[in-house]
């Protein structure tokens, strides 16, 4: 279980099958002062399922894999942490629904784990990060808790469809399954499958142009998915062997609808905007065959780590949130062969920015130093690390001491013995 981001392995693994067993595991860990690291699946971007300390016990939640409720009318489902995207997809598809998939996270990943870890979802620009409604689980001190409607006694079966207005406290439990407790059930949102889908491409000659174009298109509120990729990332996304015929940057726009006329109307609107931007909205990308179909396939069924790496090579993403000016300054810090993805958040006020480092296996020690050097420069430039990795956690704390002092005071109140995800920063 070691990786680029962690040198630690758990001393053993336990596999609870219900919340009572989770509760007993947590109570025992408190008595023994043993650190716990919950694992819903080992498929997230920076290996945050791995321990950050020695002698931790991995709590493997994969056997808690029940879909306890599916509400097709209100488009939500109540699931346990072991439910994977592949498992949830089948009953959803039968009802004309789909899950909100995450960048780089394959179908064998845990839905709940992915959402709790705040993996970047392709649907964020359209739907924003409200993929979970309510949740329940076991706190770090061994007490059972619930948020929103799950904390209430309700007779109506669709009680999880009311939205998030009563579940704001649930946001504290995002970004790390297990830091404040282990979530054993959660209501997640689903979306309707649209029969008509169209992918458009807008070529850009540099990163500054790409962020400007992203801002313009996201302001129309028409794209269901929108992101920009440099030619390295784009070639891998499309299964191309080289980058010669690809532009330096490509903005990818996906529109969805229920009638061809609806898509045609959106195309006219987006085409007019493309002309204002002195560019072209294309349905093809150079000589690449079926580029649009490949994009739709990746969004519905993300490839994961293997998209960027082959035998003998490694891939280390740098997960950040940054403004357009910060992104322009940061781009020069990465080697020319680095891949990079940018997705607009908050109507383009900031962006999910994921550049990466490529390396040959055996070079991890050297590349880790490069990673830390780049992270330090990004922090000095004001770039945010929403989910710090085990490698750069100390750096992030050093640049935000008062913020993490507050977060640790919250954690101490719920986890006085500091047994849950010790040394991890996500809350």
Can you name each region flagged by the protein language model?
Residues 8, 47-56, 60-62, 273-427:
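Conserved glycine-rich FAD pyrophosphate-binding loop
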């Amino acid at each position: 279980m070691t990786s680029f981001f962690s040198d630690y392995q758990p001393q053993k693994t336990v596999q609870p099958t219900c919340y009572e067993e989770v509760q007993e595991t947590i109570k025992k860990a408190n008595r023994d002062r043993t650190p716990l690291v919950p694992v819903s699946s080992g498929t997230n971007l920076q290996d945050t399922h791995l321990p950050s300390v020695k002698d931790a016990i991995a709590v493997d939640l994969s056997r808690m894999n029940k879909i306890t409720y599916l509400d097709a009318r209100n488009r939500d489902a109540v699931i346990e942490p072991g439910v994977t995207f592949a498992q949830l997809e089948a009953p959803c598809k039968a009802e004309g629904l789909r899950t909100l998939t995450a960048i780089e996270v394959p179908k064998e990943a845990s839905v709940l784990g992915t959402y709790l870890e705040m993996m970047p979802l392709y649907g964020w620009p359209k739907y924003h990060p409200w993929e979970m409604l309510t949740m329940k689980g076991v706190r770090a001190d061994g007490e059972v808790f619930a948020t929103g409607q799950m904390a209430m006694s309700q007779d109506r079966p669709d009680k999880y469809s009311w939205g998030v207005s009563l579940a704001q406290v649930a946001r504290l439990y995002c970004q790390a399954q297990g830091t404040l407790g282990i979530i054993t059930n959660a209501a997640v949102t689903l979306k309707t499958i649209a029969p008509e889908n169209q992918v458009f491409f807008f070529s850009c000659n540099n990163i500054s142009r790409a962020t400007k174009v992203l801002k313009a298109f996201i302001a129309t509120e028409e794209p269901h998915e929108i992101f920009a990729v440099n030619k390295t990332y784009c070639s891998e996304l499309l299964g191309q062997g080289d980058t010669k015929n690809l532009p330096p940057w490509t903005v990818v726009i996906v529109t969805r609808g229920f009638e061809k006329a609806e898509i045609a109307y959106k195309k006219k609107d987006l085409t007019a905007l493309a002309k204002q931007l002195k560019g072209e909205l294309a349905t093809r990308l150079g000589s690449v065959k079926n580029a649009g179909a490949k994009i739709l396939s990746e969004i519905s069924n993300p490839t994961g780590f293997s998209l960027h790496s082959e035998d003998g090579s490694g891939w280390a993403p740098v997960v950040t949130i940054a403004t357009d000016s910060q992104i322009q300054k940061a781009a020069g810090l990465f080697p020319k062969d680095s891949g990079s993805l940018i997705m607009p958040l908050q109507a383009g006020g900031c962006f999910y920015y994921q550049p990466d480092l490529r390396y040959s296996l055996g070079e991890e020690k050297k590349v880790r130093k490069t990673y830390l050097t780049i992270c330090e420069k990004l922090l000095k430039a004001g770039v945010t690390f929403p989910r710090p990795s085990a490698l750069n956690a100390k750096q992030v704390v050093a640049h935000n001491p008062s913020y993490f002092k507050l977060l640790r005071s919250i954690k101490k109140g719920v986890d006085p013995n500091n047994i849950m995800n010790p040394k991890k920063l996500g809350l």
